[in-house]
Amino acid sequence: MKIIEAKHFDDMSLKAAQFMIEKIQRDPTITLGLATGGTPQKMYELLINDHRTNGTSYHQVTTFNLDEYIGLDRHDPNSYYTYMHKALFDHIDIRDEQAFLPNGTASNFNAECERYEALIQQRGGIDLQVLGIGANGHIGFNEPGTSFESSTHIVKLTDSTREANARYFNDLSEVPTEAITMGIQSIMNAKEILLLASGKKKADALYQLIHGKVDESFPASVLQRHEQVTIIADREALQKVAVSSN
């Protein structure tokens, strides 16, 4: 597990973007696992700037997103489909047919979970998975207690997760109660993982991720078992972790 310390959120975003760009330039056909939310948003802006300025191409890149809300049409302003298109896809040269998200309005959600998991395998698996981390250790929408052996599945969102995401909605009542998420085993199947964290609210979670017991009560702890994990986090998030010079 490699830890890279950033000065602050913008520096974390820059280091993450540079990390991603290097991977894409080295392998133009890379398959990326992508995350949503506030943590990677600035990184996506920097990827767009690099694409426009330096011409880094996504034409042969394939992407799979971690999750999607159940019950939101993909064109709903708060769907992760819309988030990804506004934050990244609409501004780079990725092909629509190469950018995958779970279908939150599928007629059969169990079948959709199986389809999505199979699709990842058919495409050769994920080369680099981007993750954030929740204060309770969740990765994707995999909340505490999720089996480490889980594949893509339906999850009931906890009150704390819904409250954390309510800022994107008009009211807490509008936040969906369920989502489709890649499972913990799905995430662990990625060849390489990049985890981003920023702010003092993530300090306890990062400490537990790095130094805590590997246990399903703290989903991110499973990353200790992965051979290729890079953490890029700012000083506030790393305040409880001793970081050697990088």
Swiss-Prot record:
<dbReference type="InterPro" id="IPR004547">
    <property type="entry name" value="Glucosamine6P_isomerase"/>
</dbReference>
<feature type="active site" description="Proton acceptor; for enolization step">
    <location>
        <position position="67"/>
    </location>
</feature>
<comment type="function">
    <text>Catalyzes the reversible isomerization-deamination of glucosamine 6-phosphate (GlcN6P) to form fructose 6-phosphate (Fru6P) and ammonium ion.</text>
</comment>
<comment type="similarity">
    <text>Belongs to the glucosamine/galactosamine-6-phosphate isomerase family. NagB subfamily.</text>
</comment>
<feature type="active site" description="Proton acceptor; for ring-opening step">
    <location>
        <position position="138"/>
    </location>
</feature>
<dbReference type="GO" id="GO:0019262">
    <property type="term" value="P:N-acetylneuraminate catabolic process"/>
</dbReference>
<comment type="pathway">
    <text>Amino-sugar metabolism; N-acetylneuraminate degradation; D-fructose 6-phosphate from N-acetylneuraminate: step 5/5.</text>
</comment>
<dbReference type="GO" id="GO:0005737">
    <property type="term" value="C:cytoplasm"/>
</dbReference>
<dbReference type="GO" id="GO:0042802">
    <property type="term" value="F:identical protein binding"/>
</dbReference>
<dbReference type="InterPro" id="IPR037171">
    <property type="entry name" value="NagB/RpiA_transferase-like"/>
</dbReference>
<dbReference type="GO" id="GO:0006043">
    <property type="term" value="P:glucosamine catabolic process"/>
</dbReference>
<keyword id="KW-0378">Hydrolase</keyword>
<feature type="active site" description="For ring-opening step">
    <location>
        <position position="136"/>
    </location>
</feature>
<protein>
    <recommendedName>
        <fullName>Glucosamine-6-phosphate deaminase</fullName>
        <ecNumber>3.5.99.6</ecNumber>
    </recommendedName>
</protein>
<keyword id="KW-0119">Carbohydrate metabolism</keyword>
<dbReference type="GO" id="GO:0005975">
    <property type="term" value="P:carbohydrate metabolic process"/>
</dbReference>
<dbReference type="InterPro" id="IPR018321">
    <property type="entry name" value="Glucosamine6P_isomerase_CS"/>
</dbReference>
<dbReference type="GO" id="GO:0004342">
    <property type="term" value="F:glucosamine-6-phosphate deaminase activity"/>
</dbReference>
<dbReference type="GO" id="GO:0006046">
    <property type="term" value="P:N-acetylglucosamine catabolic process"/>
</dbReference>
<dbReference type="InterPro" id="IPR006148">
    <property type="entry name" value="Glc/Gal-6P_isomerase"/>
</dbReference>
<dbReference type="Pfam" id="PF01182">
    <property type="entry name" value="Glucosamine_iso"/>
</dbReference>
<feature type="active site" description="For ring-opening step">
    <location>
        <position position="143"/>
    </location>
</feature>
